[in-house]
Each structure stands twice: as C-alpha cells, then as structure tokens.
A protein has these predicted regions:
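Acidic, low-complexity terminal tails and accessory targeting/binding regions
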Residues: 1-4, 85-97, 140-146, 161-202
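Glycine-rich N-terminal loop/short-helix segment of MobA-like nucleotidyltransferase
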Residues: 14-27
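Short glycine/proline- and acidic residue-enriched helix-loop micro-motifs
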Residues: 105-126
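Short beta-strand scaffold positions
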Residues: 55-56, 129, 150-151
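Short, conserved phosphate/pyrophosphate- and ester-handling motifs at nucleotide-, phospho-/glycolipid
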Residues: 11, 152
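GST superfamily/GST-like fold recognition
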Residues: 153-157
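A short, N-terminal amphipathic alpha-helix
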Residues: 34-51, 136-138, 185-187
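Phosphate-coordination/substrate-recognition cap region in phosphate-metabolizing enzymes
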Residues: 40-106
C-alpha cells in the first residue's frame, strides 16, 4: 500500500511554557532553548528528508520550521489556518489563574475541551474545521511522499484525533502531552495509521 507520511511537530519552547501559560493565538517568541530545539529538528529533517515544510503563521512555529527548510533547500509554506486554538480570555493565563477568574467555564472546557471553549475563545471543533482542509491539501500535494508540519500542542492533538477517527474530546486523555519539537508521524493511505508519537528528533 502506498502511503503519504505527515510529520506533525510542536514548535520549540517559549517563555510561557516554563510557567504553563496558555499561548494560543498570542504570538510568543521562542526561547534560546527553543531555537536549539529547532536546530536539532533540522538535523532530523536532513536525515529524514520530507518533501515539504509547512508551518502555522505564528512566529514560534515559523521560527521552528525555518532551520529544517534551510537544511532541505526548501521554503517554509505558512498557513494561517494552522495556528493554535484561540483560548480567548485564557490566553497568557495558567490553569490556576483561570480557575480563579472563570471556574465554571474552565470546568466545562476540561470536561469536553473540543466542544466547550474558554470564554470568548475558539471551539476545538472549529479549529479542526479550519485546519483539516489545509492538511488534506498538503497530503494531495505530497501523494506517496512526506511533509513536515510545525504546529501547536492543542491543534496537533485535535488533528491527530480527527485524522485517526477518534472522538476529539478525548485529545487530552489519549495524548496528554506533546513535547516541544517531538515528531508524531501519521501514515495516510487506504487507511490512517499512527506510525510514531512524540518521538524526540535524533
């Protein structure tokens, strides 16, 4: 069976990660460690050889993708619809801070995170609806090849659920953590298959 491989990668570390703050659609830069992670990802890309490099339009994703694209002699193709879920009033806050400001909304979000957005935020289901067509177009462009997509923690997990036919509200329980610059590989052919999850770039 002929397979197209998608390498889904979370961007490198940002200053908000150490504090466990929800970055969402906020345009937060990488830390020095995040830049180093991006360089290690480029080493992985050199040995793996994806045919295309794509990223969210947010700077933390683009800066993570750029070293890999340079190493491969490619340009980064940005897509605004691959940006992270917008967490509304939760942007920049820790979960503890959210519990103090809007506890009921946080509880609903944690119970069914794809259906219940944080106040003034975006539903996970709507994020899937905007991002999945982009992913499908990338698959069509790289039929029987491969592509590297630099994304964000929540959107990446939502897309894994959608691609694999998993109920999207389960993204937290099934995929509790995606490490910065770790690679999750989905094989797309007659069926979808998870070929690797959260693998550090070697």
């Amino acid at each position: 069976m002929k397979v197209t491989k998608l390498y889904l990668v979370r961007h490198g570390q940002t200053i908000w990660h150490a504090e466990n703050r929800y970055a969402g659609s906020s345009d937060i830069a990488l830390t020095a460690d995040g830049e180093d992670e991006a360089e290690r990802l480029a080493g992985w890309a050199t040995s793996t050889g994806p045919d295309g490099v794509y990223s969210s339009s947010l700077v933390r994703a683009r800066r993570t993708a750029e070293p890999s694209a340079r190493a491969l002699g490619l340009d980064v193709v940005e897509h605004h619809d691959l940006r992270e879920v917008d967490f509304g009033q939760g942007e920049g806050l820790t979960r503890g801070e959210m519990a103090g400001r809007f506890p009921d909304a946080l509880d609903a979000f944690l119970r069914a995170p794809a259906e219940n957005p944080l106040p003034s935020g975006e539903r996970g289901l709507d994020a899937i609806a905007r991002a999945r067509p982009v992913v499908d177009d990338i698959v069509a462009q790289h039929r029987e090849g491969s592509a590297l997509l630099v994304l964000h923690s929540t959107l990446l997990r939502l897309l894994l659920c959608d691609l694999l036919g998993i109920e999207p509200n389960r993204y937290r329980s099934l995929f509790p953590r995606v490490a910065n610059c770790a690679v999750s590989t989905v094989g797309i052919g007659e069926t979808m298959a998870l070929l690797g999850l959260n693998v550090p770039p070697a």
